Amino acid sequence: MSLMGHGKVEMLLYAVPLLKAPNCLSSSMQLPHGGGRHQELVRFRDVAVVFSPEEWDHLTPEQRNLYKDVMLDNCKYLASLGNWTYKAHVMSSLKQGKEPWMMEREVTGDPCPACQPALATFRALNESGNAFRQSFHHGEYRTHRTFVQHYECDDCGMAFGHVSQLTGHQKIHKVGETHEYGENTRGFRHRSSFTMLQRICTLYKHFECNQCGETFNRPSKVIQHQSMHSGLKPYKCDVCQKAFRFLSSLSIHQRFHVGNRVNLTRHQKTHTQRKPFSCNFCGKTFHRFSEKTQHLLIHTRKKYYTCNYCKKEFNPYSKFILHQRTHTGEKPHKCDVCEKSFKSISNLNKHQKTHTGEKPFSCNECKKTFAQRTDLARHQQIHTGKKSFICSSCKKTFVRLSDLTQHKGTHTGERPYQCTTCEKAFKYRSNFTKHQKTHSIGRPFACNECGKTYRLNWELNQHKKIHTGEKPYECGECGKRFNNNSNLNKHKKIHTGEKHFVCNQCGKAFSLNSKLSRHQRTHNKKENSSKSVSNLNKHQKTHAGEKPFPCNECKKAFAQRMDLARHQQIHTGRKPFICSSCKKTFVRLSDLTQHKGTHTGERPYQCTTCEKAFKYQSNFTKHQKTHSIGRPFTCNECGKTFRLNWKLNQHKKIHTGEKPYECGECGKCFNNNSNLSKHKKIHTGEKHFVCNQCGKAFSLNSKLSRHQITHNKKKP
């Protein structure tokens, strides 16, 4: 006989003594004399033990006879309470030796004989919710009964619908403590019954999950529990193919297909009704009193599992296990596609929808779909147009409080989230979390054009628009197009004149937060200072000569990871960015953008001190430092001073005569690579710099600049 069936025989042996115990009936269960409170029904199913056909086949004849005797005793005791309506036909079935599952069908139905409500069984009611009020309104059924677990065990927190069930359950704790046949067990008719109950205590929570350590009293419970770890969902709905871990979950789901709308009707009321029932502990409100009652268990139920790290208490054990993973960092549930790990199976299931593209939640207004119900709920607030949360600084309004809280950080400039690896700081936790992934996970999505890699597929798709020239976002005012929506929104502020970002020191307003941040540095400007702690650390590496990022191809080292990434593109030999004027190709888009300025001759960056103009902001920034900071690096040979150490080292080659850069065509040597590159154009005949007035071409931009002076030269 299976262990499960054997456990039921043990349960069977103390089913009758529980009813026979002197304290098993509460005052609410006594027969009233006259008016007063209604009598609460104790029914056959509350104490019956039912075997499946498979389990019944494994019982011996002696055990089957024992079953019949005990169940007949149960019938007698229930009948003695005066309110059991199944006495005659159930006792007849027992005497005839009917199988237990046949009797269960006879006694589990509890319909009103007059109106036959479509609520089939007490078990179905329990599965559809912890509390359900059913009104019996005909004849002897005129009794209000609430299937709520009112009676709670002080030892383990387990709740029961009837005090008799609680009394019987508490004997398990008493027997577990005494292990003696004495006063606590006086309700048992036979010592053998007590001996069987002792075996329940020894088997209680004997079967342990080998993944999380949770224990169970039956192997079937362990198997059911372990499906949470494996993600296995063996029960599939024939109608919609949705899969479930448990058969009971499938049964509940199938009611939606067959027309049982009890739960749907109850749910729809949540959209129309107010919530009059409030929790005195936390203030949470509920539609129904039964929901409040169930919620109160969170505050009142004893919590047995204490976290060793933070001393927080949890119940049940599964919540305790999930909480501990926040301290240990354990993530046992791994995605098969990208190998990302999660603390719980529910988070893994949510994540997997990002790979499948499944978006089952659709907005009724705009038909946009979402992977998560919470994302849909957030989106739907957009359609209401209601923006209840107002920023006190700039009067901008927001749909959600969380958006307002994030926005306020733009006015204060506070960056509370700092990366411990590179010391970069962030205003928002979401950006900080994304940044941390750059240190821990790879970049599996690579661009076929330039080889640049990305962590997320949507980032790659956005990048590809640079190569294709696709700009689907058009400004309605001026027709200018952009490759992403965020750049379009920034541009629109030019037309609206909207300037929500105000400097708290001088009152100047800006359309973008980035412009405000740049402006605020002018107030806090100090010599040799950097924009942030992270930039200061980067700057200090230039003095120390520290270059921790080496190239695997040529072993050249760099002070910044970003510089290494730019350098590595040289080894691929790919130059996907082409100048439309001279057809010269570049590794990076920024290089192409800078190069285009050489054709126009435009110099938009002008120094206010000496009025010297520059094509590129980087050269302009370097030039400004010549006016503001010293030149600490001095040549010992000629006394010439330099701002940067590498420039001094380059200068020293003039004195030593060192010329390590040799031309492969003519053998001429140079002391730096830039001079060699200029020289090579003599051999190639390359003349990319064309005068826009006479069409003459030059190999160097400096020669073009000198030539253009001749066109602008005027006689006095």
Swiss-Prot record:
Q: Which PANTHER family match?
A: RIKEN CDNA 6720489N17 GENE-RELATED (PTHR23234:SF10), ZNF44 PROTEIN (PTHR23234)
The record's listing under Gene3D superfamilies reads:
6.10.140.140, Classic Zinc Finger (3.30.160.60)
Annotated SMART domains: KRAB, ZnF_C2H2
The name on file for this protein is Zinc finger protein 840
Matching entries from InterPro entries are given as:
KRAB (IPR001909), KRAB_dom_sf (IPR036051), Znf_C2H2-type (IPR050758), Znf_C2H2_sf (IPR036236), Znf_C2H2_type (IPR013087)
Q: Where is the KRAB domain?
A: 42-113
The coiled-coil regions, if any, are: none
Top-level taxon in the UniProt lineage: Eukaryota
Which family does the UniProt entry place this protein in?
Belongs to the krueppel C2H2-type zinc-finger protein family.
Q: Where is the signal peptide?
A: none
Localization, per the record, is: Nucleus
- Answer whether the UniProt record assigns the keyword Zinc-finger to this protein: yes
Q: Name one GO cellular component term.
A: nucleus
Q: Which UniProt keywords apply?
A: DNA-binding, Metal-binding, Nucleus, Repeat, Transcription, Transcription regulation, Zinc, Zinc-finger
Q: Where do the record's region annotations for Disordered lie?
A: 515-548
Main location, first listed in the record? nucleus
ZnF (C2H2-type) residues: 151-173, 207-229, 235-257, 277-299, 305-327, 333-355, 361-383, 389-411, 417-439, 445-467, 473-495, 501-523, 549-571, 577-599, 605-627, 633-655, 661-683, 689-711
Q: Which GO terms describe its molecular function?
A: DNA binding; zinc ion binding
Q: Can you cite a GO biological process for this protein? A: regulation of transcription by RNA polymerase II
Q: Which gene encodes it?
A: ZNF840P
Q: What does this protein do?
A: May be involved in transcriptional regulation.
